[in-house]
Amino acid sequence: MGKLQDGIAIKRINDAITTFKNYKLGELEQGGSMAINTLSNVRAHVGLAWPAILRNCLIHTSSHLGFMKFMIDIATTWKVGAFTLLGSVGDEDPFTDVDLIYTKTCLHLGLKDNDFLQFPEEFAYEANSFLEAQSMNARVDMLTGVHNIEDKYVFRMQSISKFLKAYYTASEDVAYLTGFIKPDDSKDSILSAELLKAQVTSEVLRVRNLITTKIQKYINLYEDSQLPHFRQAALSYTQDWDVDGGVPAALPQPDTTDDENPVANPGPSAPTVSKGADQPEDEEMIRKKVETSKDGPPKAVPSGNVSARGFPAFLEDDMSEMDAPDGFHDYLTREHENNFDLTQLGLAPSV
């Protein structure tokens, strides 16, 4: 594959950031989605750098919301091959320094190159481990792998569920997410920082609500499915999320008119959300506070947190593919065996 020149490398990451900035929930369900096609194209050209690019998109404020919608889509889609979008292509890394190129891309797009979320160390470790593991384990051989795609689907959904739950747990207190804000003493800078804080807080609350409602809908749809892979995934979600007990419960969330149309009436056991004390302040309230405030800049992030850009390198899958239960291949239908429709499967080519 060789190393990419900076211009081409920036173009690849540019496409990923821009796609996640504009990503809408449900893109995976659409045939010929431009967003999914673009991400597939980027994935096909960045080799082993794919998990690092996804990690940067997770932690940068501009792409965080879109990336999490993308993960929710994969976790709850009926397309059993969609998880392959997390797998890398090939065995080479065409980037000399992914983080440096990502920074250059942010500047090229007019984004701040230091607006990265600072997650707690434990979640940073888990997130990096997850993305690195999926880079290898979400691959599917196009010649032989499609015949056991449902087996891998169950394992990947269990892994993704654990990632979403780790995110949900880590974001119970959203205050730490704004530790990256370091404004100067000017009122304009403080106002800008406060607005960004409100935006990030709102996005995290929205993601938390989307996770619970979409997981609940998936369970309602597939817990009694005649197809074992859907039924097994739904059972795993039920065990991870304890939806019947209402745990975990979603944080209060402001009313929003969202283009992704979150699930309506997910069921009596679904966690509920309402407006409350944690609702982000609007711009006018923030402006008034800044004008009258005599305090200095916001406090720095606690020492217990570490920058997510300092993720420890870790490559270890969270689930062994060797533990697949017996009999999983028996439910393959004749159509699956003789005429695979890769578009319907949502399968991303690995080569």
Curated annotation (Swiss-Prot):
Segments for region (Disordered): 245-310
Function per UniProt: Minor outer capsid protein.
InterPro entries referenced in this protein's UniProt entry, alphabetically: Phyto_Pns9_10 (IPR008776)
Family that this chain belongs to: Belongs to the phytoreovirus minor outer capsid protein P9 family.
Pfam families the UniProt entry points to: Phyto_Pns9_10
Subcellular localization, as worded in the UniProt entry: Virion; Host cytoplasm
Main location (coarse class): virion
Basic and acidic residues compositional bias, start-end: 285-297
Protein name as it appears in the record: Minor outer capsid protein P9
Entry's Gene Ontology cellular component terms: host cell cytoplasm; viral outer capsid
Keywords on record: Capsid protein, Host cytoplasm, Outer capsid protein, Virion
